A protein has these predicted regions:
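Residues forming the flavin
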Residues: 2-425, 429-431, 435-489
Length: 489
């Protein structure tokens, strides 16, 4: 086993994690940045492997200059010993070890290919959790057909492999994220047949203060809309995908227009041909590690389970801070601000002398959080999506559990919350452990019991004692109890 001793461990190297690490390191704290990716940037600044082909980052990435300058500075600090960068390290458990935290990692495929296979434990006096989020998916007829992918998956293929997902693509769901996905596909050769948006941006008229506090967001959206117009991509607001069509693979989608009550208008259903459907209903915060540590949570405006933090981004667990999507989905700009606040607060708790004034950051965070709250209210998931789930609609792909099995677990077997439904019908018990079907199962359970979705429903699919797949041999080996004297193996 390889062990490292640092002042602060930052888990996650996306926008929030990079900002936290740099803020703390520049304040004089020795920092370890631990991330599952082999290159920094997280999902937002995902980049292709070296040699993958010609690559112009500015065409795919927003805020690329900030990322590269931050990454360069962290590399410079790593050369001085102030920063330890652990890429390709999957954190599967975090445990209290006296007055420190033991961050247990297993290595991904790329480090193993270079001859490094020993497990790694990072001992740190403080933690910043910047674990990010993943695509939120909802079931609908035909969503398990080959050719139906997540909106984030389509973007990941483009950013990480320079691969366009299909020839004729429809981007659907709700939220501003659909625009950069469609824009990226169109700019790199795909024929984007349509963007099917369940809501309308006119809803921002109800939140003038939030829009004025984040004018950059408005300009960003206007830029995407202008480029889509130049590529002749039609954006259909207040429309939803009612079903994916095809036998062996996707051949088209059935869409319909929603009225002001969120119902499908009679006579508006029509078919659009496509070979790929990229669907996105927002994001689900990745909370395995915060829940493992016992951090308090609450439901956010978008019905996500998120970590509760104070003004310093501190969680309910002493010595642990959280930043970014784990504390509420709000985009990369908000994540970087929260990450910097968390990094500075963690550094101050360690006695760092040169901690910057955080008041401007807090004002910026307040504005961005206001915009995020407005965004979630403008782009809610329409009730009609889950209402149209017939008993035959597959919900859990891993265990092949349909919507009827979930309904019967509640109506016939008496389940009153999602954990019991999980035990009775087995949704979320397969390979993905509920990462794909968990939110939908929680919502369907709440619907059948006649109530709103609650924290316990969502915790049932995120509360895991092991945060990521780990070899059985690692579980069989004892964890290191002794604390190392310093960095080393």
């Amino acid at each position: 086993m390889t062990e490292h001793l640092v002042d602060l461990a930052v888990i996650g190297a996306g926008p929030a994690g990079l900002a936290a690490a740099l803020a703390a390191a520049e304040a004089g704290v020795r920092v370890a940045v631990v991330d599952a990716g082999v290159r920094p940037g997280g999902q937002f600044w995902r980049s292709p492997a070296p040699g993958a082909g010609p690559f112009r980052p500015a065409t795919l990435h927003h805020g690329w200059h900030w990322f590269t300058s931050t990454d360069d500075r962290l590399t410079e600090l790593a050369g001085t010993g102030r920063v330890l960068r652990l890429a390709g390290h999957h954190v599967w458990s975090v445990q209290a070890a006296g007055d420190q935290w033991a961050v247990h990692c297993v290595l991904g495929a790329e480090p193993r290919q270079h001859g490094t296979s020993a497990p790694v434990t990072v001992h740190a006096r403080r933690l910043v959790l910047a674990t990010g989020a993943y695509d939120r998916q909802l079931p609908f007829p035909g969503w398990d057909l080959p050719g139906v992918i997540t909106a984030g998956g389509a973007q990941a293929l483009l950013k990480g492999n320079l691969v366009v997902a299909g020839q004729r693509v429809i981007v659907a769901g709700t939220g501003p994220f659909l625009l950069p996905v469609a824009d990226g596909l169109a700019r790199h050769g795909a024929r984007v047949a349509a963007v099917i948006e369940a809501n309308s941006p006119l809803g921002f008229a109800r939140f003038p203060g939030a829009v004025l506090g984040a004018t950059g967001k408005l300009g960003e959206a206007t830029g995407y809309a202008g480029r889509l117009l130049r590529h002749r991509v039609a954006v259909h607001h207040r429309h939803v995908v009612l079903g994916a069509l095809g036998t062996d693979r996707l051949t088209g989608v059935l869409v319909g227009r929603l009225d002001r009550n969120g119902r499908v208008r009679a006579g508006t259903e029509r078919q659009i041909d496509c070979d790929v459907l990229a669907v996105g209903w927002g994001f689900t915060p990745q909370l395995e590690l915060p829940l493992q540590l016992g951090c308090a949570t609450h439901l956010d405006v978008d019905k996500s389970l998120v970590v509760t933090v104070d003004d310093d981004q501190a969680t309910s667990v002493a010595g642990v801070w959280a930043a970014g999507e784990a504390t509420g989905v709000g985009g990369a700009d908000l994540a970087t601000v929260e990450g910097r606040i968390a990094g500075l607060a963690a550094a101050a708790s360690l006695g760092a002398d040169a901690v910057a004034d955080g008041r401007p950051l807090r004002r910026r965070r307040s504005s961005l959080r206001g915009f995020a709250s407005a965004m979630h209210q403008v782009y809610p998931i329409p009730d009609i999506v889950l209402e149209r789930c017939s008993d035959e609609t597959l919900v859990c792909r891993c265990e092949e559990v349909d919507a009827g099995s979930i309904r019967r677990a509640v109506v016939d077997l008496g389940a009153t919350e999602a954990r019991t439904v999980k035990l009775l019908a087995r949704p979320g018990m397969g390979w993905c452990q509920g990462r794909v079907c968990g939110f939908a199962t929680a919502c369907l359970t709440a619907r059948h019991t006649g109530r709103a979705v609650a924290e316990p429903d969502l915790r049932a699919f995120a509360d895991r004692s092991i945060a990521t797949p780990v070899p059985l041999g690692r579980l069989a080996a004892p964890l290191a109890d002794e604390q190392p004297d310093g960095d080393g193996g």
